[in-house]
Amino acid sequence: MFPLLGLFGGTFDPIHKGHLALANELIQKLPSLTEIQFIPSRQPPHRPSPLASPADRLEMIKRAIANQPNLILNDVEIKGNDISYTINTLKILRPLFLTHALCFILSTDAFADFKHWHQSSVILEYCHLIVVNRPNYRLPQQPWLSDLLSHHQTENAEDLGRFQFGKIFFQTLSPRPISATQIRHYLAKGDYEIVAPLLPKTVLTYIKAHKLYQQ
């Protein structure tokens, strides 16, 4: 059996309690998943540029995951100078973790667009996909999606450890309707009291000190 290494990509603009709760619940529900690496993207392929700088987003993640040894910061995409394509990240990480099964974590709505990812046809040659539910979202019925799942989906979490790559596993987690977009909206207006329950205290302190997301 291969130990599982979770890869959690995103802009984390900013990182919030929903991200942390997702990672910790995944570790609880998948015993073989002992570590999740947060991989902030420099420039995501299908989204506008993050509002906070790479340096600020790295620092916020560092503060958010401090004293949580199962959660690790990986700056591989921040170090890049180009668009942060998942396949390029996997090609860098695969040789570094030859004894692990890499598990890329994504939401159902992101998975619904998987066909349009750069070199999506080879991504599963490097990793598994762990697809987590998004509140109030259902996967569309599309032929390409049905075909992909018929070849790769497993309902047995142990398959993620039996194989190093190639499996798609759906994991249901507690719903957490926390939106970074909404958080940025309130931060732009200086409504710190509204976002305080949604952000780690150390992250909110950093945002205030550096006047991030202000209009």
From Swiss-Prot:
Reported EC number(s) for this entry are 2.7.7.18
| Gene Ontology biological process | NAD biosynthetic process
Q: What class of enzyme is it?
A: transferase
Q: What are the entry keywords? A: ATP-binding, NAD, Nucleotide-binding, Nucleotidyltransferase, Pyridine nucleotide biosynthesis, Transferase
**GO molecular function annotations of the record:** ATP binding; nicotinamide-nucleotide adenylyltransferase activity; nicotinate-nucleotide adenylyltransferase activity
Any single Pfam family the record assigns to this protein: CTP_transf_like
**InterPro entries named in the record:** Cyt_trans-like, NadD/NMNAT, Rossmann-like_a/b/a_fold
Q: In which pathway does it act?
A: Cofactor biosynthesis; NAD(+) biosynthesis; deamido-NAD(+) from nicotinate D-ribonucleotide: step 1/1
The signal peptide here is none
The residue stretches assigned to a coiled coil in this entry are: none
**What's the superkingdom here?**
Bacteria
**Alphabetical list of Gene3D superfamilies matching this protein:** HUPs
Quote the catalytic activity from the record.
nicotinate beta-D-ribonucleotide + ATP + H(+) = deamido-NAD(+) + diphosphate
The UniProt function text for this chain reads: Catalyzes the reversible adenylation of nicotinate mononucleotide (NaMN) to nicotinic acid adenine dinucleotide (NaAD).
Q: Give the family from UniProt.
A: Belongs to the NadD family.
Q: What is this protein called?
A: Probable nicotinate-nucleotide adenylyltransferase
Write down the species: Coxiella burnetii (strain RSA 493 / Nine Mile phase I)
Instruction: Provide the organism lineage as a comma list.
Output: Bacteria, Pseudomonadati, Pseudomonadota, Gammaproteobacteria, Legionellales
